């Protein structure tokens, strides 16, 4: 214990700014990622001499190093925190379900553009603003923008088939351009105001609205003045969620990350205020190298040693170094142009800086992934269960439904090399009482292990079921009836608070009940597999439920197959709008004749 982390010494030099902190153990393994409005104040709570919760005390006992990243505000800290948790899955963090990508605000092209949420590749014509730290934050921003400027958010298929204003117009969230209740010039002004805000020009926008408010007051239009006052207040509330766009000038953003075993420098190129792209570099450095040392070496080799390479007028870095003044002087003389290297930045540049840090963290994590944390967890599980050797194959089952609707069971498979996604299976559960998880589990296990009799499938070493004694008893019964050779049964029951780290485990006949420490690698493996089974089950359930709810009277119409049905619903914006359409309106849809339109109309109005 002589090498215990010196919290007091660390806090003496810790920033009081907002940011993200990362706690690592003596092996350099990430234990916990957190965010704070005041880093020093938040971190001081971990190093009190008394009053720590047991789980917190266990965490602090393992800390060998704490790393911090200063951010411009709490929103930026949240973005970075989520990125790191997503990539590292630290054992002391609550592991939220992973989103595949951060959402963007999308503004479409056209005479009456729409605002919406976008994920994935940017293939649609229009403008993108973001990324945002969460779907919740982007929905809040869109809701406030909708309230302030009333730009439509409906899909184009819905928009072009309206014959009267929708509910959004009635509650003053849309000016109903679909039915001509707003002039194109007025709508364009609302779009322009929305873009100003999304570009980060909220101060200029607020000044413009303030001037309009004063003019309204002078003309005694107090109702309009009050509306403008409320718009300004709304804008101030969401200034922290502005997009990456809206910067100016040419900038290279460099973020270096150094960890045991390697380093990464992530470069983001910004030209004319727009992010053009990014790239990772992995210099060979020693473990003792500091971030500033890595950055100084990179600047010299990347720019100074390559005079033909484009050099912007500004370089943003995530650490400082004593060699920077000399590098600036040398590059200025070499390129005959002014150069600034900045460490402390704000607003959009701070956003670029934090995103570069997050990307460097992710890239380095992938670079060092062959250390195979998962293999070590399998070893720990073997020790916890007193096995002679680590298991080679683990399967986990979970059930998902909505009040008994569209029940789906999942089976995920893991080996020492990780998830074996090619062997995942889903089972649509039929013929059981709605909401009966035991019957659903019985059916899924029977279908899975019944295949073994036919020589199909592999026998797992460990079968995990998400549930307590009841689910474990069902699994035992099924395996007994099918004469499945001996395998280890492990039930995972959440604690009373349903928080990770408080699970109760049941082994085989459920007589052996035990728990594992919250920092146990064996427990982390069990949680990881269970959470993956839950994710796989719930995505399957949602897909099945959505398909069932989309079925309609259209299925009874000859000549309207699945493809044409999808195209019809897309064209009209949903079944409800299609049902309201006349025969002539239906016939305007691509591929629909007058005769077929008559049949569709009759089917939809047969009652």
UniProtKB/Swiss-Prot annotation:
Cellular component annotations (GO), alphabetically ordered: cytoplasm; excinuclease repair complex
GO function term, MF aspect, one: DNA binding
Compartment annotation: Cytoplasm
Leader sequence segment: none
Record-stated family: Belongs to the UvrC family.
Entry protein name: UvrABC system protein C
Gene this chain is encoded by: uvrC
Record function comment: The UvrABC repair system catalyzes the recognition and processing of DNA lesions. UvrC both incises the 5' and 3' sides of the lesion. The N-terminal half is responsible for the 3' incision and the C-terminal half is responsible for the 5' incision.
Domain UVR span(s) in chain numbering: 203-238
Pfam families membership: GIY-YIG, HHH_5, UVR, UvrC_RNaseH, UvrC_RNaseH_dom
GO biological process, one term: SOS response
Species name: Azotobacter vinelandii (strain DJ / ATCC BAA-1303)
Segments passing through the bilayer: none
GIY-YIG domain boundaries: 16-94
Main location: cytoplasm
Alphabetical UniProt keywords: Cytoplasm, DNA damage, DNA excision, DNA repair, Excision nuclease, SOS response
Subunit structure comment from the entry: Interacts with UvrB in an incision complex.
SUPFAM superfamilies: C-terminal UvrC-binding domain of UvrB, GIY-YIG endonuclease, RuvA domain 2-like
């Amino acid at each position: 214990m002589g090498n215990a982390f010196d919290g007091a010494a660390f806090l003496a030099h810790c920033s009081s700014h907002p940011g993200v902190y990362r706690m690592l153990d003596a092996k350099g393994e990430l234990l916990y990622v957190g965010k704070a409005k005041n880093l020093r104040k938040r971190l001081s709570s971990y190093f009190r001499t008394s009053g720590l919760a047991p789980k917190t005390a266990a965490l602090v006992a393992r800390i060998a190093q704490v790393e911090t990243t200063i951010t411009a505000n709490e929103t930026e800290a949240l973005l970075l925190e989520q990125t790191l948790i997503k990539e590292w899955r630290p054992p002391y963090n609550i592991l939220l379900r992973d989103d595949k990508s951060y959402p963007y605000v999308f503004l479409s092209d056209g005479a009456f553009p729409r605002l919406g949420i976008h994920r994935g590749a940017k293939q649609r014509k229009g403008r993108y603003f973001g990324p945002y730290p969460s779907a919740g934050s982007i929905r809040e921003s869109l809701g406030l923008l909708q309230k302030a400027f009333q730009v439509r958010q409906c899909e184009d298929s819905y928009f072009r088939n309206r014959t009267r204003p929708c509910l959004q117009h009635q509650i003053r969230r849309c000016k109903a351009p679909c039915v001509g209740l707003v002039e194109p010039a007025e709508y364009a002004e609302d779009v322009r105001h929305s873009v100003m805000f999304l570009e980060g020009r909220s101060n200029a926008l607020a000044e413009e609205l303030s001037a309009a408010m004063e003019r309204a007051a002078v003309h005694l239009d107090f109702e309009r003045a009050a509306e403008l006052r409320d718009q300004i207040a709304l804008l101030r509330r969401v200034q922290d969620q502005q997009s990456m766009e809206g910067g100016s000038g040419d900038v290279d953003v460099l973020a270096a990350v150094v960890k045991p075993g390697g380093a990464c420098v992530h470069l983001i190129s910004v030209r004319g205020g727009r992010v053009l792209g990014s790239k990772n570099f992995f210099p060979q450095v020693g473990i003792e190298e500091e971030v500033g040392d890595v950055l100084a070496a990179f600047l010299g080799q990347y720019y100074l040693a390559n005079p033909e390479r484009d050099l912007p007028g500004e370089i943003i870095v995530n650490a400082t170094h004593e060699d920077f003044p000399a590098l600036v002087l040398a590059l200025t003389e070499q390129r005959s142009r002014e150069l600034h290297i900045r460490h402390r930045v704000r607003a959009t540049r701070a956003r670029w800086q934090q995103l570069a840090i997050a990307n460097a963290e992710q890239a380095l994590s992938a670079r060092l992934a062959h250390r195979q944390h998962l293999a070590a967890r399998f070893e720990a599980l073997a020790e916890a269960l007193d096995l002679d050797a680590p298991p080679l194959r683990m399967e986990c089952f979970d059930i998902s439904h909505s009040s008994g609707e569209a029940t789906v069971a999942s089976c995920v498979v893991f080996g020492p090399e990780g998830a074996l996604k090619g062997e995942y299976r889903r089972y649509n559960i039929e013929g059981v009482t709605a909401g009966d998880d035991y019957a659903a589990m019985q059916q899924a296990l029977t279908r899975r292990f019944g295949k073994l009799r036919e020589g199909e499938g592999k026998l797992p070493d460990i079968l995990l079921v998400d549930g307590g004694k009841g689910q474990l008893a069902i699994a035992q019964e099924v395996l007994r009836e099918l004469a499945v050779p001996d395998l280890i049964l492990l039930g995972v029951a959440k604690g009373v608070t349903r928080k990770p780290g408080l699970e109760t485990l049941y082994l085989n006949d459920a007589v052996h009940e035990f728990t594992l420490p919250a920092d146990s690698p064996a427990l982390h493996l069990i949680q990881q597999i269970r959470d993956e089974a839950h994710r796989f089950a719930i995505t399957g359930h949602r897909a099945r439920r959505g398909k069932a709810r989309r079925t309609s009277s259209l299925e009874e119409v000859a000549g309207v197959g699945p493809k044409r049905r999808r195209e019809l619903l897309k064209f009209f914006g949903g079944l409800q709008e299609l049902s309201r359409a006349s025969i002539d309106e239906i016939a305007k849809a691509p591929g629909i004749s007058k005769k077929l339109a008559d049949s569709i109309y009759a089917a939809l109005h047969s009652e």
